[in-house]
Amino acid sequence: MKVLYIVNMDENNKKGLFMATHEKIKAIMKLHPENEYKIISVQFKDTGLFRAIKKITGKKTYDKTSDEFTFDGVNYKKVYLSIDMKSKNIEKQEDDRARFAEFFSGCKEDIENCDIVSCHWGYPHGRIAYWINRDFGKPYIVTYHGSDVHTMPFNNSDIKKKVLQIMENSVQNIFVSKKLMDTARELGYSGDNCTASRNGVNTEKFYPISEEEKNEIRNKYNIKGKNIGFVGAINEVKRSDKFAEIFEAIKNLDSNNEYTFTVVGDGPLKSEVEKKCKEKNLHVVFTGNQESDGVRKFMNTMDVMILPSKREGFGCVVTEANACGAAVVGSNAGGIPEAIGIEENVVNDGEGFEERLAKRVVEVVNSNNDRDAISKHTMDNFAWEKIAEDEASFYGKGALN
């Protein structure tokens, strides 16, 4: 069987979506070497007047770079869609196939040769799969990861209509959490061609390290006492604007313990968070963005990791932290409760959220957490090899339809 993947992956931003998609595809390729695989990463480039206006106003422009990239032994072909005034107008039309002309002209042979299309990201990537089905008769599967369901369609009525068309005409819709699938129902999706299949964790990259290695990291970054961590983008969606309040509440609720707060990542609110934490005299270590090796080491030093997001697809970072032995306390957004799996460690949104989250963190810190047991449970239940088979099982179904 020949499988064509259409993905939303930026090699310069190897974070949640990139890694979740890559790990799943890599696991499928390993499990089913009898298949042939082609992966196309759809990216964007600003052109014409649209690009000129962005340059004049100092906004970030998207430019064409390489034609492909290889990561972790997997090759990705890159196809660029132009962003200009013409493309913006086409996007508003019901028949928007012309928006993807660059993809069809650059990938016609790949489309004709494949037996099934597996698309990772609802829009516009899933829309390409929709038109491949209409024009070439190829069946398709779409995996939805988060904001392609819980944000974009709710903010734009044109996108909403098109995402629903994508869902209704696919062989299978795969949602990374039950919550995300429920959100699709709220959107208006009524089909039964769906399943919830959580994301996994790469147990070769996330695992417990030795006490000697932990102490080395602690000493290097001046991590003292109990270490409460966060890993991810420092932005409003992750509720980063409330980090200082959460950290202060933890410190005040448990004055008998010394606390370090470790923030792994970067984002638009970093400077603001740093300033507020400094004003509150909190001991916070900001590490900046880290590759997986660095993330693993910091997670191993954490007593508890927090994930107070306002919205989330699944929350791969939860299982990664668990694989390293760290307990996690988070919000009830998206698939976070499913990833955490411990009801008491999920804090409902609402009044006093920050204080209630802090209270639960302190309770977990002062309980007897078996790091080895946490890690083993995660590795037994969230290994990518098990998760990947969920998607692969639909390939034959699609080819038969």
Ranges and model annotations:
Residues 318, 327-330:
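Short hydrophobic beta-strand element within catalytic cores of glycosyltransferases
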Residues 289-290, 297-302:
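Short alpha-helical donor nucleotide-sugar binding micro-motif in glycosyltransferases
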